[in-house]
Amino acid sequence: MNMAKQIYYRRRRKEHARQKCNDLLRAMMGEDLVAQWWTGPNHAFDMQTPETVFDKDHERVYAYIMTSVHGEW
C-alpha cells in the first residue's frame, strides 16, 4: 500500500474512533457534557485533556472510554 493510502486509512480510523467515543460519551453523560469532557483536564491522562491525548494516541482514549462503559471507573 502506498504512503498516501496509509495516511488516508489512518486518518479514517482516527475519525471513526472519535465518532465512536462521542457516541459512547453522549450515552453516558448526555450531549451537554461531551465537549466539556474533551477539553477538561482528566486524572486518567495525568491531567492532560482527552483532546490532547487523543491527538497523540486515539486508541488510549478509546480504551479508557470503553473501560468506563463497562463500569471500571
Per-region residue spans from a language model:
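Non-transmembrane "mature" sequence context
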Residues: M1-W73
